[in-house]
Structures are given as structure tokens and as C-alpha cells.
């Protein structure tokens, strides 16, 4: 007896993107790539798998990501601990060090691709999701911090988004954070009785992250904690003031958020998030900041850097809520045909039209004209090219508009095959 194979479903929190939504993804990525090119950013592609120690060192061993959320396994061939990337910055910095990219000049780079976190799936939070990661490596001044925020404001405008707001903070430099850390630990020790399990665990290892709590019982304690901003020295304040002045010059509104620390340990000086109320609990659309110590931390020569990451699924969700997105057509031209000779001719004509730069679907298989036209209309094609018996005999094609022109301009016309590509292209 043949055993019935139980069908396999996608892993929870790892979603298929089917042809309809995928077309919107492609349009979205086209906008994003054009936007990044306009600021001089070039694409890089790094592996999905990296050595686990890269993320433990780069992100921080006591972060939620490293402690709870990474997909990690042991390589059966050599015993190495490997991890599916939970974010892209560490891998891009690793690549810049390995390939000596910062030897002679700074670089503006970006990457688009999947990342993986072992989380409880919900709207806007998935186990496999996609990021747009943008990094400016080797740039030290607040002008590049400001440019990154301004370029994000431009992206929101390109996408027609309005309900996105900027939150801003400075984390200062390591020595300033050390002084603040000591004061913060004293504050947390005085409130140990109200700390939750995460708070008590992080009180000494990563006290700044305790303030980033979502626990309502700890909010008053967090609000009264010493502010890192009060510990900033002259250089850090000057950097932050320079950033704020440039944002004012660009007309960018923002809210100072002294509790904004981000979930990654490598940040210093500028940190920012773009947030919205339209995505429920997962309201952060984009987050980033400066990480001047990360290149050296991962074994390279000291080099400043700043970057951000956008969650693509969240931004696509927001885009689809904000504007009406036209579903892209499967093709421009759909060829219908009659008989075996018509089918063979259609295949040749399809290739000729593609040579001319047109997107073409040739109806597959044999069917009546009614069924073929139904499929042509469903494809979203503007024009149907008809190769019936008369057309095959006369070496012509009939052109029928499926959408677009009306009246006389929409009338069906017959043209010689030799002129077909030019006529179709003239119809734009």
C-alpha cells in the first residue's frame, strides 16, 4: 500500500510571496534602488550564513537578538558554530574588513535581502523577513548622519507616506556611557523590587537596555532614570547639535527621545527611528545610527560609520495602506492564435517582439479564441495580437486593444508582420 505523503507547509513566520504580491515587491524595490542610486549608494551582497562569533561580538552577547533570537547550528563538517544572519550590518562590516574596502576611501553601500530571527510571529514581526540595509563606511561628520535622515524623508515622499515621524537621540561616546552606566546602575539598584526578570538580569551587564522596557510597571522608574544626554561631553554635544542644525535646514521635524537606545550594542552618538501608529505594536519602520567602533571591534583599523535598516514587510504594509498601488500587468502584448501553423507562427512572432523590447506572452496550448481572450484580459495586457487563419495566410497580424484607447483609436487593425513591432511600439 502506497503511503500518503502529508503535504508540507511553510514554516510559521516564514512567508511565501506569490506572483501578485511579488509584482508589488518588484515595483517597490525598483523605487528603492533608484532612490539609493540617486545618493551614490552601490549594491553589495553578503552571505546569509556567518560565523556565530561575528554577531556575538558585533551585536553584543547580552542583546535579545544574540541571547534569544538567532538561528544557530553546528556545521557537521568542521564543528563551526554558524548563524543565519539576524541583521546585515555586521556582515557588511566583516566584508569591508576582509576585502580591505576602506584602505583608500570611504564607501556608500546597500544590501537588500532576507534576515532571520527566532521570534513569535505576529503582524510586522516574522522569522524570515527582508531588510534594506544602507551603510556609509568611513564617514565621520554629522553631515552624513543628516543626509541619511534626509534621504529617508525623500523615500517617504516618493512612496506617498505621511504618517511617519522621526525620533532622535545621542548615545555619546564610550567614556560618557560608562559614567552614565554607573549612575544608572545605582538608580536600578534602588528600584530592584520592581524590575522584571529581564531587568534584573541586565542590570549590570547592559543597564541601558533596561530602560527600553515595554513593561508598564517599570515605566515610572525608567522615566526617572538619569539621562544619558546629561553626561555627554562637548564633542558629542557638538556632533548632535550639528546634526540637529542640518535637519532644521532641511525642514525635517523630529522628537528628542532620551530613551531611544536601539537593540544593538554597537551604536554610539546618533541613533534614530522612523515610527508610525498605523502598524499596531510593531511601529518602527526604520532604525539606524552611528557605529564608529564596530570596524575596530571586528578586527579592522578604526573607521567611523553610520547606517540604517528598513523592514521591507512593514514598509510595504504601510505603503499599501497609504496609496492605491496598481497591480502591474503580466505583459504588454498577448498573442492569441488558431491552429498548429498559427501556434508555431505565434512563437516566432513572440521572439521578434521581445527582440524589439516588448513584454510578450504567447498563449500556451490550443484553445478557442474566447478562452484565449479571457486569459489575455486577465493578464493585464494592453494589446492582443491575433494570428488566425486569415492572418497566417496573408502574413499579417490583427491588433486589438484590451485597455487604453477608446473610439477610433481603439479600432482593430491589421498590419503586415514585418511592421508589427514598430506599430506596437508606436502605441506606447
Swiss-Prot record:
Gene Ontology molecular-function annotations: ATP binding; histidine-tRNA ligase activity
What is the annotated localization of this protein?
Cytoplasm
Name of one Pfam family that matches:
tRNA-synt_His
List membrane-spanning regions.
none
Q: Gene3D superfamilies from the entry?
A: Anticodon-binding domain, Bira Bifunctional Protein, Domain 2
Question: Which reaction equations make up its catalytic activity?
Answer: tRNA(His) + L-histidine + ATP = L-histidyl-tRNA(His) + AMP + diphosphate + H(+)
BP GO annotations: histidyl-tRNA aminoacylation
Q: Does the keyword Aminoacyl-tRNA synthetase apply?
A: yes
User: What keywords would UniProt list here?
Assistant: Aminoacyl-tRNA synthetase, ATP-binding, Cytoplasm, Ligase, Nucleotide-binding, Protein biosynthesis
CC per GO annotation: cytoplasm
- Chief site of localization: cytoplasm
E.C. number(s) listed in UniProt: 6.1.1.21
HAMAP family, sorted: His_tRNA_synth
Share what the entry says about its subunit structure, partners included: Homodimer.
- Which family is this sequence assigned to? Belongs to the class-II aminoacyl-tRNA synthetase family.
| Name the UniProt record assigns to this protein | Histidine--tRNA ligase
Amino acid at each position: 500500500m502506497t503511503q500518503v505523503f502529508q503535504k508540507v507547509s511553510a514554516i510559521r513566520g516564514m512567508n511565501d510571496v506569490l506572483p501578485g504580491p511579488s509584482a508589488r515587491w518588484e515595483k517597490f524595490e525598483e523605487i528603492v534602488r533608484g532612490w539609493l542610486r540617486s545618493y551614490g549608494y552601490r549594491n553589495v551582497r553578503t552571505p546569509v550564513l556567518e560565523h556565530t562569533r561575528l554577531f556575538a561580538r558585533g551585536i553584543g552577547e547580552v542583546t535579545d537578538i544574540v541571547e534569544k533570537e538567532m538561528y544557530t547550528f553546528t556545521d557537521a563538517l568542521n564543528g563551526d558554530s554558524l548563524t543565519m544572519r539576524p541583521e546585515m550590518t555586521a556582515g557588511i562590516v566583516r566584508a569591508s574588513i576582509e576585502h580591505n574596502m576602506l584602505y583608500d576611501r570611504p564607501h556608500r553601500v546597500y544590501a537588500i535581502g532576507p534576515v532571520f530571527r527566532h521570534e513569535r510571529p505576529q503582524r510586522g514581526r516574522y522569522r524570515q523577513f527582508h531588510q534594506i540595509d544602507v551603510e556609509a563606511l568611513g564617514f565621520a561628520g554629522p553631515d552624513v548622519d543628516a543626509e541619511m535622515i534626509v534621504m529617508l524623508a525623500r523615500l517617504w515622499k516618493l512612496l506617498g507616506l505621511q504618517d511617519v515621524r522621526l525620533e532622535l537621540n545621542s548615545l555619546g561616546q564610550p567614556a560618557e556611557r560608562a559614567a552614565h552606566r554607573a549612575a544608572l546602575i545605582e538608580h536600578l539598584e534602588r528600584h530592584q523590587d520592581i524590575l522584571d526578570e529581564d531587568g534584573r538580569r541586565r542590570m549590570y551587564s547592559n543597564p541601558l537596555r533596561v530602560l527600553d522596557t515595554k513593561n508598564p510597571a517599570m515605566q515610572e522608574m525608567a522615566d526617572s532614570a538619569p539621562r544619558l544626554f546629561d553626561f555627554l561631553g562637548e564633542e558629542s554635544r557638538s556632533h548632535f547639535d550639528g546634526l540637529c542644525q542640518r535637519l532644521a535646514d532641511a525642514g525635517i521635524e523630529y522628537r528628542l527621545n532620551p530613551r531611544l537606545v536601539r537593540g544593538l550594542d554597537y551604536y554610539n552618538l546618533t541613533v534614530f527611528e522612523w515610527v508610525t501608529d498605523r502598524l499596531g505594536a510593531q511601529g518602527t519602520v526604520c532604525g539606524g545610527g552611528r557605529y564608529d567602533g564596530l570596524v575596530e571591534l571586528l578586527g579592522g583599523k578604526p573607521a567611523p560609520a553610520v547606517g540604517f535598516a528598513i523592514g521591507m514587510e512593514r514598509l510595504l504594509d504601510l505603503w499599501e495602506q497609504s496609496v492605491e498601488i496598481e497591480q502591474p500587468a503580466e505583459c504588454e502584448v498577448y498573442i492569441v492564435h488558431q491552429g498548429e501553423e498559427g501556434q508555431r507562427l505565434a512563437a516566432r512572432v513572440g521572439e521578434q517582439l521581445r527582440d524589439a523590447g516588448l513584454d510578450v506572452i504567447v498563449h500556451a496550448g490550443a484553445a478557442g479564441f474566447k478562452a484565449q481572450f479571457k486569459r489575455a484580459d486577465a493578464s493585464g495586457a494592453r494589446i492582443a495580437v491575433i494570428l488566425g487563419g486569415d492572418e497566417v495566410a496573408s502574413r499579417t497580424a490583427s491588433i486589438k486593444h484590451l485597455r487604453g484607447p477608446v473610439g477610433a483609436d481603439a479600432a482593430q487593425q491589421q498590419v503586415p508582420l514585418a511592421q508589427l513591432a514598430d506599430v506596437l511600439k508606436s502605441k506606447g
